[in-house]
Amino acid sequence: VDKMNITNSVAPVISHWANYSHGLDALLDIWNVVLGLAVFFLARMLGTLYIINNVADETLRARSRKQLLYNTAAFLLLFLPFLIRTLLKDGFAYDPATGVISMESMKYLYNLLDMWYLSVVLLVGVVLLLFGIVRTVMCNNYIKGIWPAGIGVVLVVLVLLLIAGWNNTAYYPSNVDLQSSLTIANSCSSEFTLTTMSIVSLFIPFVLAYIVYVWYAMDKDKITKEEVKQGDVY
């Protein structure tokens, strides 16, 4: 990272890759692969829950419940070790007074404990996710598991992102030069840009409301075999 390079009118780039792999060397870290596989099975879980909620076919729903159980087991076997390892590993602490980045034992666990409200959000997210999955598997007449599970996933992912960047933490550590790790402080935009983004963010509730309305309009009628057989199919 070289912030002075922003004065270069030809190439005002303040950061660059340290080698020609352009970040692909991250694949050599087995834990990144574990996380990627966990996300893969999580996507399959949510997709299965969506099918159960939106396809009016009991045979397909029964098969989907079995697939949900298998994918949930695979997800937990991958995600739980990753989460435990992340909370117990050394983290990248940032000193706001000096700008120095250093290693700190169990930094992410301490972030979770220091910001107790994130712990509450994490707990709520986990409970919602488990509720959506368990009730869908155990109750044949329950089809709305996508809603609590989906909300739970959003909350858990949000907490993981925040403990990786808040509380003076480098969210994108450098494997080559520790002091070149990216933090919120050294990678944020100018005050003008941040002010503009803050104003634009006021419209987010309206965007979310539109998304909710559109999804409701699309999903209020369940998909049936007759619908698939007749008319245009997309």
Where in this protein do the model-derived segments appear?
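Long, contiguous internal "core" modules enriched in hydrophobic/ aromatic residues
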Residues: 1-142, 159
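Membrane-interface transmembrane-helix boundary segments in multi-pass integral membrane proteins
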Residues: 106-120, 186-202
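Membrane-helix cytosolic exit motif
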Residues: 207-223
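Alpha-helical transmembrane segments of multi-pass membrane proteins
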Residues: 39-42, 156-163, 203, 207, ...
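Short, membrane-exposed interhelical loops at transmembrane-helix boundaries
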Residues: 100-106, 172-194
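Short, highly charged, low-complexity non-transmembrane loops/tails of multi-pass membrane proteins
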Residues: 220-234
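Juxtamembrane non-transmembrane "cap" segments at the membrane-aqueous interface
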Residues: 2-11, 158-179
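Central hydrophobic cores of alpha-helical transmembrane segments
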Residues: 146-155
